[in-house]
Every structure is written in C-alpha cells, then in structure tokens.
C-alpha cells in the first residue's frame, strides 16, 4: 500500500496493470485498501494478447465492473492489424508482442508509471530489478541504470518521455500470494483450481487445447485433472497436474514446490537463458 501511495503521489499519470491473474488480483485488493473509500487515482489496464483463457477475461471484466473503475485494453491484435508487429502464426506465441502494445498505450495516454504484479522469485531477471524500475524514453530497461533503493526511500522522478515500472509485490513469494488470497478471500479465475481439461503434452508441458492450440499429427489431446499456477497467453502457458480445489490445498502444494510458477509452466521463458531479461530490455513488464 505504501508503494502504491508513493507512486500515486510522485507520478503524474500512473496506471495499474491487471491481467486477471492471481498477482494482479492481489494488487487490486491492496489498491482498495490504499485508496478506498475514494476511487483509484489511476485507471486499470490490461495488455490483451487476444489468446487469453476465456475464464480470465470474464473474471477481468466482472472484477473491474464490481470496483466501478476505468478499464483500458491495449490490444496486441490491434498492433498486428496496424502493422506494428507481425503475427507469429498459428503456433507462435503473442506474449512477446505485448511489449509493443504496452509501450504504444503508455505513449498514447501519457503514463509515467505502470504498476505491475511481478515478483522477484519468479525469474532471475526480475530478481535483480528494483521496486521502482526506471525505463528510458524508449521504454527499455537497463540494469546498470537502476537507482539505489535504501530502506523505503524511492525516487519516482522521471524526465518527459521516461517512465517507471512499479512492483509493490517484488519481495512476495508465490506462497505469500496464496496465503494472502486465503486470508482476504480474494476471488480468482476458476482455472487456478483443479478441474478437468483437455490438454496436449508438448515440450514437457501440458498445454490446454483451445482455438489456438491444437494437436499436431504426432500428438493427441487427453483429459486430465489440472490447474494453472500462472495465467498468460494460452499458447505458452502450461497446466500442472493437481487435485487442489481449495486455497488451503494449493498452499500445501506450493509449500512443497521447488520450481517457480514461470519456470515450470511458461514456454516463453524457455527460448533462452536470458529470455525475460531480453524482453525487459525491449520494454516488457
């Protein structure tokens, strides 16, 4: 809450990024605690790949409507239609294309700070990122240009065209997130809990069969009891085998896990050892 208030106080036009996932659902609850009974001092924005799980989009729209806040949607499909980026094709992921849609929206609306739900335990690139992460006029992240953060002293000063990414959940872990969800009774999309789903095993991951993910000639779809540890583009987000249908059961699973949710279930992080850092240098979340 302190970090959100700090960003709202120091920055002229911040925005809260909301994907409909568990981390951004926690961010919304923290924003409620920080600013209610007034309205949020920033709009809510989703960078939509167009390949999202329907349950997540339904939850996104319902949750924002319940809050009575403004929702902006930065569309990857629009970036493709206008020639800003190339369509990766039927088997490609649009996850990396979110960078262009995000930066275009930041420029369009004049945002100087974007509040996101990234955590340091997710990936080694995020582990070395500041709570207030400085981005240059091109939206790019340079680890060598990050500002020192001593105690709870944060600098939100930027020049015109520059911006910040703010990560209030930086020091939280996946276990912290789920414990907070349980304590606060935070609603989540149903795909976070165990359910029957048709999946395809590909490259060691269980991808949900969908309009964008179909079995290849040497593959077959099978119905399994699974849940998702993280949500993203359906073409690169894998499920895990699970029987956990309650928050308490998920907490027990997470406590035994030794691999982060991104490391275990995100194909877009497997392109190279520096996949996340490369994307951040381009302007990713």
Sequence positions of predicted segments:
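Nucleotide-activated chemistry modules centered on ATP-dependent adenylation/adenylyltransferase
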Residues: 1-285
